Amino acid sequence: MIEEAPIILCGFPSPAEDYREDVLDFNSYLDISRPSVYALRAKGFSMTGAGILPEDIVIVDKSKEAINGSLVVAAIDGYFTLKRLLIGKTIILHPENPDYEDIHLSSLEELTIFGVVTAIVRKL
């Protein structure tokens, strides 16, 4: 927990620069104290268009309902992936990088949605 999170302007100085926020609790801010929320480390480049880079920490909530357009952690026949869920006449797991192809799910494949991405954490 960070005891104090001062506000710092990235533009012109402000007379309000000495204003300070209350305690910044990342557990509360990212809503990670609930048992349905977990963190995963991203690997690969298929989701760079969604702002997810290798080594990012992806916060996932198992209790959220995945809807069309959600970023989801899914398992296809037991293999895990993070993609954008597109629901239409068929279900597509869409990578957010043009160098990667969509995953079109057939009726023979077993899809399990493990959770919806709610936040990304990245070190600079």
Regions found by a protein language model. Name each.
Residues 55-56, 70:
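Structural motif
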Residues 96-107:
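Low-complexity, intrinsically disordered Gly/Pro/Thr-rich segments
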Residues 59-60, 73:
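Hydrophobic beta-strand signal
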